[in-house]
Amino acid sequence: MAEITSAKATARTVRVSPRKSRLVLDNIRGKSVADAIAILKFTPNKAAGIIEGVLNSAIANAENNFGLEKANLVVSEAFANEGPTLKRFRPRAKGSASPINKRTAHITVVVAEK
Protein backbone atom coordinates (compact mmCIF):
# COMPACT_ATOMS: atom_id res chain seq x y z
CA MET A 1 0.00 0.00 0.00
CA ALA A 2 1.32 3.44 -0.91
CA GLU A 3 2.27 5.80 1.88
CA ILE A 4 0.05 8.86 2.35
CA THR A 5 1.94 12.12 1.80
CA SER A 6 -0.88 14.69 1.76
CA ALA A 7 -3.73 15.90 3.96
CA LYS A 8 -6.82 17.96 3.18
CA ALA A 9 -9.14 20.32 5.05
CA THR A 10 -12.36 21.94 3.84
CA ALA A 11 -14.57 24.74 5.14
CA ARG A 12 -18.01 24.52 3.60
CA THR A 13 -20.64 27.26 3.12
CA VAL A 14 -18.37 30.02 4.41
CA ARG A 15 -19.97 33.49 4.20
CA VAL A 16 -17.31 35.04 1.98
CA SER A 17 -17.26 35.52 -1.78
CA PRO A 18 -15.47 32.75 -3.73
CA ARG A 19 -13.87 35.35 -6.00
CA LYS A 20 -12.34 37.25 -3.08
CA SER A 21 -11.22 33.94 -1.54
CA ARG A 22 -9.42 32.96 -4.75
CA LEU A 23 -7.42 36.20 -4.70
CA VAL A 24 -6.00 35.20 -1.30
CA LEU A 25 -5.57 31.50 -2.19
CA ASP A 26 -3.47 32.43 -5.25
CA ASN A 27 -0.92 34.03 -2.89
CA ILE A 28 -0.30 30.87 -0.81
CA ARG A 29 -0.48 28.11 -3.43
CA GLY A 30 2.89 26.33 -3.74
CA LYS A 31 4.42 27.98 -0.65
CA SER A 32 5.68 26.21 2.48
CA VAL A 33 3.13 26.19 5.30
CA ALA A 34 5.25 28.56 7.43
CA ASP A 35 5.40 31.10 4.58
CA ALA A 36 1.68 30.67 3.87
CA ILE A 37 0.72 31.34 7.51
CA ALA A 38 2.93 34.44 7.56
CA ILE A 39 1.32 35.74 4.36
CA LEU A 40 -2.20 35.14 5.70
CA LYS A 41 -1.46 36.84 9.03
CA PHE A 42 -0.59 40.08 7.22
CA THR A 43 -3.37 39.99 4.63
CA PRO A 44 -6.08 42.46 5.75
CA ASN A 45 -9.00 40.49 4.37
CA LYS A 46 -11.93 38.57 5.87
CA ALA A 47 -11.14 35.59 3.64
CA ALA A 48 -7.53 35.45 4.91
CA GLY A 49 -8.64 34.68 8.47
CA ILE A 50 -10.94 31.89 7.31
CA ILE A 51 -8.28 30.42 5.01
CA GLU A 52 -5.72 30.51 7.84
CA GLY A 53 -8.07 28.38 9.94
CA VAL A 54 -8.52 25.88 7.10
CA LEU A 55 -4.74 25.74 6.56
CA ASN A 56 -4.11 25.11 10.28
CA SER A 57 -6.72 22.34 10.17
CA ALA A 58 -4.99 20.72 7.18
CA ILE A 59 -1.64 20.89 9.01
CA ALA A 60 -3.19 19.30 12.11
CA ASN A 61 -4.73 16.55 9.94
CA ALA A 62 -1.32 15.86 8.38
CA GLU A 63 0.43 15.65 11.77
CA ASN A 64 -2.19 13.73 13.75
CA ASN A 65 -3.76 11.44 11.15
CA PHE A 66 -0.79 10.68 8.89
CA GLY A 67 2.28 11.45 11.05
CA LEU A 68 3.72 13.99 8.60
CA GLU A 69 6.31 16.57 9.69
CA LYS A 70 5.10 20.21 9.70
CA ALA A 71 8.49 21.54 8.53
CA ASN A 72 8.27 19.45 5.32
CA LEU A 73 4.75 20.50 4.29
CA VAL A 74 3.85 22.74 1.34
CA VAL A 75 0.45 23.98 0.14
CA SER A 76 -0.01 21.74 -2.91
CA GLU A 77 -3.62 22.66 -3.70
CA ALA A 78 -5.82 25.56 -2.61
CA PHE A 79 -9.14 26.36 -4.23
CA ALA A 80 -12.54 27.91 -3.53
CA ASN A 81 -15.73 26.67 -5.14
CA GLU A 82 -19.11 28.38 -5.15
CA GLY A 83 -21.46 27.43 -2.31
CA PRO A 84 -25.19 28.09 -2.02
CA THR A 85 -26.19 31.71 -2.65
CA LEU A 86 -28.33 33.56 -0.10
CA LYS A 87 -30.85 35.62 -2.06
CA ARG A 88 -32.00 38.92 -0.53
CA PHE A 89 -33.86 42.01 -1.78
CA ARG A 90 -33.01 45.69 -1.38
CA PRO A 91 -36.02 48.05 -1.45
CA ARG A 92 -35.77 50.69 -4.17
CA ALA A 93 -37.76 53.69 -5.33
CA LYS A 94 -41.46 53.52 -6.26
CA GLY A 95 -42.10 50.24 -4.48
CA SER A 96 -39.67 48.18 -6.52
CA ALA A 97 -36.83 45.98 -5.28
CA SER A 98 -33.43 44.86 -6.52
CA PRO A 99 -32.00 41.40 -5.87
CA ILE A 100 -28.87 40.99 -3.76
CA ASN A 101 -26.86 37.76 -3.92
CA LYS A 102 -24.91 37.01 -0.76
CA ARG A 103 -22.41 34.45 -1.99
CA THR A 104 -20.84 31.62 -0.02
CA ALA A 105 -17.76 29.51 -0.72
CA HIS A 106 -16.43 26.01 -0.11
CA ILE A 107 -12.71 26.51 0.65
CA THR A 108 -10.32 23.54 0.34
CA VAL A 109 -6.61 23.44 1.21
CA VAL A 110 -4.39 20.40 0.57
CA VAL A 111 -0.92 20.18 2.13
CA ALA A 112 1.68 17.65 0.96
CA GLU A 113 5.26 16.72 1.80
CA LYS A 114 8.01 18.25 -0.34
UniProtKB/Swiss-Prot annotation:
Domain of life: Bacteria
Cell inner membrane among keywords: no
MF terms in GO: rRNA binding; structural constituent of ribosome
Database matches in Pfam families: Ribosomal_L22
A GO BP annotation: translation
Gene3D superfamilies reported for this sequence: Ribosomal protein L22/L17
Gene Ontology, cellular component aspect: cytosolic large ribosomal subunit
Keyword Glycoprotein carried by entry: no
Subunit structure: Part of the 50S ribosomal subunit.
Job of this protein: This protein binds specifically to 23S rRNA; its binding is stimulated by other ribosomal proteins, e.g. L4, L17, and L20. It is important during the early stages of 50S assembly. It makes multiple contacts with different domains of the 23S rRNA in the assembled 50S subunit and ribosome. The globular domain of the protein is located near the polypeptide exit tunnel on the outside of the subunit, while an extended beta-hairpin is found that lines the wall of the exit tunnel in the center of the 70S ribosome.
Family listed: Belongs to the universal ribosomal protein uL22 family.
Protein name: Large ribosomal subunit protein uL22
Gene that encodes it: rplV
